[in-house]
Amino acid sequence: MSGFYHKHFLKLLDFTPAELNSLLQLAAKLKADKKSGKEEAKLTGKNIALIFEKDSTRTRCSFEVAAYDQGARVTYLGPSGSQIGHKESIKDTARVLGRMYDGIQYRGYGQEIVETLAEYASVPVWNGLTNEFHPTQLLADLLTMQEHLPGKAFNEMTLVYAGDARNNMGNSMLEAAALTGLDLRLVAPQACWPEAALVTECRALAQQNGGNITLTEDVAKGVEGADFIYTDVWVSMGEAKEKWAERIALLREYQVNSKMMQLTGNPEVKFLHCLPAFHDDQTTLGKKMAEEFGLHGGMEVTDEVFESAASIVFDQAENRMHTIKAVMVATLSK
């Protein structure tokens, strides 16, 4: 794909609005072709390395299925399956894998790791998630939003993110809003706002593209008129137990529930979540939360909202594969 060949995909602000839009158009075409049985393999003979320092369901499956659909082969390197950063430096790992593979996906820790891989690998490197950014998720989110509001431009859409906005999702949403002109509202306690420098940079770009970025602690004001309400988990199994109580106390009033959905005043408002979601007590962590903190109806989102007709989370999950496929095709085929 012209302009993308041999490029890295590390964060959204590395691209222009036009480039982002062309990736979304390619993803929509690849999705339609797959469903109609007309998909053409553009990556036959390509070899792809998937480095996972953090386990994943959606990201791994999306990369593997997308690669297989396009005729490529993959090697999965899990948390215990490589020497990266332990016995071998990131720089050396990049130079080794770059000699053997046509593309490398990295999902793990600091953004500096994926940036170093990109600097030394000599092949396209894709960010499957770092502590700072999650760009492939936002591609899927944007495609899903387009599908559910056909005919509307992004700068005519309002996206609310409720909860902990200081993480990789909050940062990537800021970058997405900057490029698309979304009306993005981060509804969160001030302690959970992203870094001010990134907010300032992205707000200026968003305004140039017809959008706006708002940070507020006021739930009612923040969600008014929203087309989409998005949230993510508040805690993870890797965090100290002491953090759980602190985080839940801080974010409890930002839970996505039927009241919040109604406060939008939009009967067609949709619910988004990057998954996994703790919406019931059917998981190990969900059960712990229910028992220790009384969160029997869900944590960051209630089961009622998650299972409602407003929920489009599984459309999002499917679109991870189509958008990741677009990234690989665009960067590996001429």
UniProtKB/Swiss-Prot annotation:
Presence of keyword Kinase: no
Which UniProt keywords are present, listed alphabetically?
A: Allosteric enzyme, Amino-acid biosynthesis, Arginine biosynthesis, Cytoplasm, Metal-binding, Transferase, Zinc
Please state how the activity of this protein is regulated.
Answer: Reversely inhibited by N-(N-Sulfodiaminophosphinyl)-L-ornithine. Zinc is an allosteric regulator of the substrate-bound enzyme and a competitive inhibitor of the free enzyme.
Q: Name one GO molecular function term.
A: metal ion binding
Name the predominant localization: cytoplasm
Gene Ontology process terms (BP): arginine biosynthetic process via ornithine; citrulline biosynthetic process; L-arginine biosynthetic process
Purpose of the protein? Reversibly catalyzes the transfer of the carbamoyl group from carbamoyl phosphate (CP) to the N(epsilon) atom of ornithine (ORN) to produce L-citrulline, which is a substrate for argininosuccinate synthetase, the enzyme involved in the final step in arginine biosynthesis.
Annotated protein name in UniProt = Ornithine carbamoyltransferase subunit I
Name its species.
Escherichia coli (strain K12)
